[in-house]
Amino acid sequence: MPTGEERARLVQEMFDRIANRYELLNTLMTAGLHRVWNKKAVEATGLRAGGWALDLACGTGSLTRDLAGRAGPKGYVLGIDFSREMLRAAKKRPVPGIEYQLGDATDLTGVESGSFDAATIAYGARNIPDLDTLFAEMARVVRPGGKVVCLEIAQPEGRLSATFYGLWFDRIVPLLGSKVSGDAWAYSYLPESVKEFVAPDGLADIMRCNGLQDVTWRGFSGGIVTLHVGTKPG
């Protein structure tokens, strides 16, 4: 698999291509469980009515809308993604209190420090080569006591879960993704990117090294998804 700028370009182009089928495929590939996982992530933010949240790698806005639902009509949620087509799809489902911007999750120079109650990234961290900068920026933009939440696909450790995972993600997901989206590379990239991603304990260490404390993580659905949560000191 390509690395560096070439990989970033290919991944960006991939998301542009699959944007219109992205949410349908998420539902098919997870049997709808992604909605449950997203709910867990939203709960972990501790976001209150009227709160402000930043959703990085927001894609078509699935988690962004859930955050807005929790923040309520007086809240504000900013969704940032590097794919124009994913943002175009997100904007087709407008929700009061949400703003979408094209941008880089590792370069939030336009976002004021300490301006958000929570920052989230769901299923996007494994697409970002520089995790140190990602989490340093997420920690910077949340207020003291604010939460940084990362929801990500993982490799399960249990034998039964690992066997199912191997069958599903290595064989069925690429076939299903190719048939529905017409993009074979996109859904062969998915299992490969998960295999290459840092282990959950390692991800927790990266968060701790970049301005976050009380970092915890837990797995869901047999460990195929992990939820990491850290708090900005203060």
Question: Model-derived features: where do they sit?
Answer:
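A short acidic, Gly/Pro-enriched loop at the edge of an enzyme's catalytic core
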Residues: T106-A119
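Conserved alpha-helix/loop element of class I SAM-dependent methyltransferases that forms part
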Residues: T30-W52, D66
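A short SAM/SAH-binding and catalytic strip from SAM-dependent methyltransferases
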Residues: D117-L131
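C-terminal alpha-helical "lid/dimerization" subdomain adjacent to the S-adenosyl-L-methionine
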Residues: R9, L151, Q155-N210, T216
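Class I SAM-dependent methyltransferase SAM/SAH-binding core
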Residues: W52-L108
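Core SAM-dependent methyltransferase catalytic element
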Residues: G211-G234
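A short glycine-rich, Lys/Arg-flanked "PGG" loop and its adjoining helix->strand segment in the class I
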Residues: D132-P144
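Short glycine-dipeptide loop
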Residues: A49-G50, P73-K74, V142-K147
